[in-house]
C-alpha cells in the first residue's frame, strides 16, 4: 500500500508540475522604438514585460415597461497595465506631460505551445494612445525586484485578436474574425 501511495503522489506532483508549465503565460507591451531590445525572450525582443493588464467595456441598460431591456452606446474603459519601471517609463511620463500620443501600442499575452515556445495567444492593438495616469509604488523587502508602476491608457481604436495553437506543430493561427472598433466614430474599424 505504501508503494502505491508514494507512486500515486509522485504521479500527481509530476502532473501538476506539467500543468503549470503548460498554462504559464507572460504579458508583453510594444510601443515602437521605445521598447526596442526590451526583453531577451525569443519573438518578443522589441517588447517590455508587464505583470498585468485590465480592460473592459460597458453599455448602459434601461428597461422600459413591456418592451424589455434597451442597450445604449458602449463606453470603453481605459486600459490599465502594471509593470516594473523600465526603459519605457520615462517615455510614458513624457507622453503624459506633453499630451503626445503613441501611434500604436500592442499588448500580447503569450502562452507556451506544445513545443514549449512562447507564442501570442491574445493580442490587443491600440491606435492613437494617450497616457492618462501613472502611479509608482514601492515596498521595502529584502529581495524585491524594482519599483512598480501602474499606467492607464485611452485610445482612439482597438483591435483584439485571439490565437489557437496546432497541437502537433505548436503553430499559432489567428482567429479569422478579430474584434475591431473605432471608438471616436463608433464603428467596427481599426
Language-model features, listed with the residues they occupy:
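Positively charged n-region of N-terminal signal peptides that target proteins for export
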Residues: 1-4
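Bacterial N-terminal signal peptides
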Residues: 8-18
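Glycine-rich, low-complexity intrinsically disordered segments
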Residues: 22-190
Amino acid at each position: 500500500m505504501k508503494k502505491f501511495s508514494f507512486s500515486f503522489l509522485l504521479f500527481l506532483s509530476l502532473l501538476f508540475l506539467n500543468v503549470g508549465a503548460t498554462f504559464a503565460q507572460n504579458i508583453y507591451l510594444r510601443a515602437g522604438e521605445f521598447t526596442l531590445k526590451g526583453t531577451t525572450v525569443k519573438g518578443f525582443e522589441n517588447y517590455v514585460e508587464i505583470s498585468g493588464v485590465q480592460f473592459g467595456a460597458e453599455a448602459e441598460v434601461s428597461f422600459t415597461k413591456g418592451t424589455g431591456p434597451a442597450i445604449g452606446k458602449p463606453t470603453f474603459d481605459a486600459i490599465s497595465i502594471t509593470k516594473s519601471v523600465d526603459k519605457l517609463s520615462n517615455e510614458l511620463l513624457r507622453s503624459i506631460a506633453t499630451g503626445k500620443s503613441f501611434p500604436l501600442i500592442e499588448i500580447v499575452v503569450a502562452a507556451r505551445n506544445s513545443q514549449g515556445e512562447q507564442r501570442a495567444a491574445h493580442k490587443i492593438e491600440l491606435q492613437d494612445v494617450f497616457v492618462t495616469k501613472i502611479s509608482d509604488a514601492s515596498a521595502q523587502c529584502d529581495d524585491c525586484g524594482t519599483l512598480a508602476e501602474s499606467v492607464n491608457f485611452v485610445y482612439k481604436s482597438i483591435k483584439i485578436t485571439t490565437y489557437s495553437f496546432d497541437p502537433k506543430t505548436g503553430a499559432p493561427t489567428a482567429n479569422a474574425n478579430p474584434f475591431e472598433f473605432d471608438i471616436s466614430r463608433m464603428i467596427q474599424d481599426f
